[in-house]
Every structure is written in structure tokens, then in C-alpha cells.
């Protein structure tokens, strides 16, 4: 899969979660902050990243840099996705279903951020299992990576789109 250059895109950032984490040492606890950020151009490109630092803004900055390195391209048909898909990560699972125009983004928390920044405006989703933000974001990404356009599938099978769709 080819790398997407983040400098050519107008990316919007959204902080999904900021967590205070502690390392217990002999003298007490060392506190740091971890941040989960989703970036996207609302036109079929989206990425997520995590960052950890002693200060919240620094953690967010690191997460944004990380997110720009993990961009993926999402096939969008009109305002929705081409077909139904199930994304998995750990104990988290998310079902993504295409929806008719005007439905809106029906998704909870972290998944909503990913789908909106990907540029999908009509979709139904259901999160099952783990509801930790990082697991939900990764499961959503897994689902989005599985999506294929009808033209791509037809080319792989050596058929026309009409033959494929009947």
C-alpha cells in the first residue's frame, strides 16, 4: 500500500481521548499523559495516532504527528461506504453498514470521529465488545481498510462491473 503524503492534504484534527497514566517508582508515581488523535481531510483520507508526554499539549502534538504517518484511503460511494463490513481489534468489534442519503453518521464516540473525518456522511454502525477508545478506533480502521470499490473487485476477477453486479 502506497504512503499518502499528509502535506498535500488539508487535514483536520480531532482529539478522541486524553488519558493520565502513571508509572509507579520508589519515590511515588510519575504521571504522564497519553493522547489519541484522529486526522482526516473529509474526502476519503483518515489516520489516527497516539502520543505520550508529561504535558497534554505535547502529547497531542506527538499524536497528530503519528496520525499523519498512518493515513489510509477510504473508498466512498456517494456519501456512504460501498458495502457492509465488520472491523475487529482485540475484543472490540464494529459493524459498518452503508446508509441511504440523509441518514447521517450513526456511530458512537471514537468511531464517529473516524467516520466523519474520513468524509462519510451517511453510515450505520454498531460497536460490540470492548469500548475503549483506542480499540474502537483501531476496529473502525480495520473495517475501513477492508472496503473495496466494485471497479477494483471487477478488475481482480477479470470481469466488468455490470457482470459483477448482475
From Swiss-Prot:
Cystine pairings recorded for this chain: none
Q: Where is the S5 DRBM domain?
A: 11-74
Question: What's the name of the protein?
Answer: Small ribosomal subunit protein uS5
Q: Which SUPFAM superfamilies match?
A: dsRNA-binding domain-like, Ribosomal protein S5 domain 2-like
Among the Pfam families in the record, one is: Ribosomal_S5
Give GO MF terms, alphabetically: rRNA binding; structural constituent of ribosome
Notes on the domains: The N-terminal domain interacts with the head of the 30S subunit; the C-terminal domain interacts with the body and contacts protein S4. The interaction surface between S4 and S5 is involved in control of translational fidelity.
- Assembly state and interactors? Part of the 30S ribosomal subunit. Contacts proteins S4 and S8.
**Its biological function?**
With S4 and S12 plays an important role in translational accuracy. Located at the back of the 30S subunit body where it stabilizes the conformation of the head with respect to the body.
Can you supply a Gene Ontology BP term from the record? translation
Q: Which UniProt keywords apply?
A: Ribonucleoprotein, Ribosomal protein, RNA-binding, rRNA-binding
Gene Ontology, cellular component aspect: small ribosomal subunit
Tell me its family: Belongs to the universal ribosomal protein uS5 family.
Concerning NCBIfam families, the annotation shows: rpsE_bact
UniProt cross-references to Gene3D superfamilies, sorted A to Z: 3.30.160.20, 3.30.230.10
Q: Gene of origin?
A: rpsE
Organism name: Geobacillus kaustophilus (strain HTA426)
